[in-house]
Regions:
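N-terminal active-site segment of His-dependent metallophosphoesterases
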Residues: 1-53, 59-68, 138
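Active-site-proximal loop/helix segment associated with metal-binding centers of metalloenzymes
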Residues: 97-166, 173-182
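Active-site neighborhood of phospho(di)ester-bond hydrolases with catalytic His/Asp-centered motifs
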Residues: 5-7, 27-32, 52-57, 82-86, ...
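A basic- and aromatic-enriched beta-loop-alpha substructure that forms the phosphate/nucleotide-
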Residues: 52-59, 64-125
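Beta-strand-turn-beta hairpins that frame and shape the catalytic cleft
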Residues: 1-4, 88-98, 164, 219-224
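Active-site environment of divalent metal-dependent phosphoester hydrolases
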Residues: 10-16, 34-39, 58-68, 88-90, ...
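Binuclear metal-dependent phosphoesterase catalytic core
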Residues: 79, 179, 185-206, 212-266
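A structural motif corresponding to the C-terminal end of an alpha-helix
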Residues: 76-81, 151-164, 197-206
Length: 266
């Protein structure tokens, strides 16, 4: 199976990226494709293959955090796009598990100070609304983080003997995903959590995430962790990621029933 991987496209600000010359078997869009319904609408009309779609924080801007998922499901209805929010889908024997995975703000050890920093540093807490129309708080997104972590522990650690598992989250599951130069940045607690134990215990073949300041590719236990972001917020603007690859694809080899499997990059 060939899996295309991109994230943080910000199509409403940066325009549509170049498309792969050859459509993969599955396309993984790991969040922040566009604000509101723009990302889902674009993806549904752009890709002819099945699309795994996870929401990033940017998609919720100027929308209701609690109800927006269902609005997007209605938008995607009847298309080849699969919106995963603490959900699992099977495609050609591959198990895909997806969630936004908001952070716990404890990347630097103290969640309380991380939440205070988030309110000051992250514009999500100005522009994303709750059901009462008021700005959401770090406590609101931390509650969603706990729901996702609980789902991932229950689901991803349940062995899947008929194929391999791919986990897709928007926010990063490990501090190892933070690029050099940003590892002391207090804002990093808004896009990554220390979930190394979960990654190792889930033992997925691949964990795709987004929301960081550059490409990611490393092993954590038996799991390959990758990210391929196109753009990153800078102040109130955006800048492009120098090493973004619009055609980034991983191909799965091996037979999971025989306990074999590896990825090659194209």
């Amino acid at each position: 199976m060939r899996i295309g991987i991109v994230s943080d496209l910000y199509i409403d600000k940066l325009g549509s990226p170049p498309l792969p010359t050859e459509m993969p078997d599955v396309m993984v869009l790991a969040g922040n494709i566009g604000c509101g319904t723009k990302g889902v609408e674009w993806a549904a009309r752009t890709y002819t293959c099945p699309v795994i779609y996870v929401l990033g924080n940017y998609s919720y801007r100027n929308h209701d955090l609690a109800g927006f998922d269902e609005e997007l499901r209605a938008t995607a209805w009847g298309s080849n796009l699969h919106l995963l929010q603490n959900e699992t889908i099977f495609i050609r024997g591959m198990r895909f598990i997806g969630a936004t995975l908001w952070t716990d703000f404890a990347l630097f050890g103290d969640a309380v100070s991380g939440m205070v920093a988030a309110e000051n540093l992250c514009e999500d807490y100005k522009y994303i609304r709750n059901s009462e129309g008021k700005p959401v708080t770090p406590a609101d997104t931390m509650a969603l983080h706990r729901q996702s972590v609980d789902y991932l522990w229950r689901t991803a650690t349940d062995p899947y003997d008929d194929g391999h598992t791919v986990i897709v989250t928007h926010h990063a599951p490990s501090s190892r995903s933070i690029p050099a130069g940003y590892q002391d940045d207090r804002a990093a607690a808004c896009f990554a959590s220390n979930l190394d134990e979960l990654v190792i215990e889930a033992d997925a073949m691949l964990w795709v995430h987004a929301g960081v300041y550059g490409p990611v590719d490393y092993m954590l236990g038996n799991t390959r962790v990758v990210a391929n972001p196109r753009g990153v917020p800078v102040g109130k603007g955006l800048r492009g990621v120098e090493n973004f690859r619009a055609d980034y694809t991983l191909e799965m080899h091996g037979n999971p029933r025989e306990g074999t499997g590896w990825w090659s990059s194209t």
